[in-house]
Each structure stands twice: as C-alpha cells, then as structure tokens.
C-alpha cells in the first residue's frame, strides 16, 4: 500500500539500508535483524572479499554471531566479482530463506541495490582467456591510448566513456573482444531484480558531512591499529592484477605504495582517508541522482523509528 505521496506504508518484504561509508549502516542493520528476526545481507562490493575484513569494515566475528550475516567475505580477491554475480547470489539466497525471515540488505554499492529492484543489463560473461589477452595488450599503455583503440572498435562506447576511466574502457574492450558487439547493445535487455514489485523500505543514511568526514578519518586510523597494513601486505604478496576490484579498494593502493617504500606510513593513511572521503561524496551524489524518491534520506535513529512503524503494520496494509 502507498501513501498519497507515493511512499510504501505497509509491512515491507525487505529492508534496504544504503548510505556513504562510515554512516552507521552496519550497526542499524544488525539492530533491525536482532529485533525482528532478520538476516543481514551484504550489499557492498568490497565486503564480499575474504581478503579485506579490516579495510572494508566488515562486521566483526562477534557481530556476525549476534544475527545471521550472508554474502560477507565469501569471495576470493582473485575474482572479478560483478553486479551480475551479486544479483544471482542474492536471488539464490532469497529463494532459500524461510518465509518468516526478514532480509535486511546493507551496504554502499548503488548498483547492487539497483540490481535487487530495477534489475540490471544482461551483460555476457567474458572468458578468462579473452580477459587475460586484453589485459596483456593493455599492460603499460596509457588509458587514453586504450580509449583511442576502443574508438576504432566500438565508437559508440568510446563516445560515452571518459578517456581517463580505465576500468570501464577495459570492460568495453573485453566485451567487444568476446562478442564482437558494443557493450551498449546489451543494455536494452535487462535481468529483473529478485525484489521487483515487492513492498520495500529503502533507507539512505544521510550523515552530516563534517561529522562523516571526521568519522572516516578516525576509522581509517583505527583500521591501521587493527591490522589493515598486515592485511594489505598479505594481499600484495599474491601479486594479483592491479585492475581487480580488491586491489583498487580504498586504502589498498596507498598502503601498497608504503610497503613498496615510495611513501611514508602517514602519507598512506592520509591518502586512504582522502580517497574514502571522496568516495563518500560520490555515494551521496549517485544516490541523489540515480535512485529516485522511494528512498528515505534519514538518520540512523529516525530510520529505526520508521522501521519499527513499518514492521508493526499488518501485512498488506
């Protein structure tokens, strides 16, 4: 059921908690799951990786023991885990959950949330051999050179992509090499989301900017105290492709540079803090422009009150 302003008012089939990093999403998700018999489901592209428990701010083992947590730390860093992988895993998990269990999706990755409801483009899987060939060809090449190569093969995609966006330029090159088609030609066909058409409570924790900045900076220092450098050192020893998502996580490039001896520990911390602050700003911007009016921009306490009100409503009301 909807109110006159278009907002859902009845009991939701799932709760979606998004927001910038360090905004209190995990704590709210755990609170809801404990109070209402829910399962906390990771919706963050870095917290899926087993390699980055500390640096991705995954829930602690103690927190995971207080309520069921799923899709956390289940993927090896060598895997290029995509939104398509996430959507399939989330759909499978939802089909396995007991009817009375409340799914509580928690994270900061906008495309993951979109895949749950609106669905995603049906992009083909790129064979590992093709991906490796493109990576070898691109090794040592400036991104602008790769963009020029894309313009010759797939001018439509090159027109849409910034010449400095290496990750997306590489993705377009891989898709074209694997299929002979523009990546844009796959965007019309969509895979529907597993929560499409269901009543949802969508919460975006819009923490005050200066307070968020201070929390981000303090949290990065705490991560260092909790072993983030050792975590990255172990990742560095694996010598993974630097374009893999796990190698581009906030804090990883700077800490690797410190381990390589090119910058100091303090410079690595400052770089990680700055990268994370800029990411939080992009999260605000993306959700504001991409996710529509169905999302409640709120604080953790106001969100908790809203959850209590919605979950006390009879089904179908």
Swiss-Prot record:
Keyword entries, A-Z: ATP-binding, Magnesium, Nucleotide-binding, Transferase, tRNA processing
A GO BP annotation: tRNA modification
Protein name as it appears in the record: tRNA dimethylallyltransferase
Primary role: Catalyzes the transfer of a dimethylallyl group onto the adenine at position 37 in tRNAs that read codons beginning with uridine, leading to the formation of N6-(dimethylallyl)adenosine (i(6)A).
Family that this chain belongs to: Belongs to the IPP transferase family.
Chain sites annotated for binding substrate: 21-26
PANTHER family: TRNA DIMETHYLALLYLTRANSFERASE (PTHR11088:SF60)
The protein's Enzyme Commission number: 2.5.1.75
Region (Interaction with substrate tRNA): 44-47
HAMAP family named in the record: IPP_trans (MF_00185)
Oligomer and partners: Monomer.
Binding site for ATP: 19-26
Annotated site, Interaction with substrate tRNA, chain positions: 109, 131
Native source organism of the sequence: Methylorubrum extorquens (strain PA1) (Methylobacterium extorquens)
Gene Ontology molecular-function annotations: ATP binding; tRNA dimethylallyltransferase activity
Catalytic reactions on record: adenosine(37) in tRNA + dimethylallyl diphosphate = N(6)-dimethylallyladenosine(37) in tRNA + diphosphate
Top class in the EC scheme: transferase
Known cofactor(s): Mg(2+)
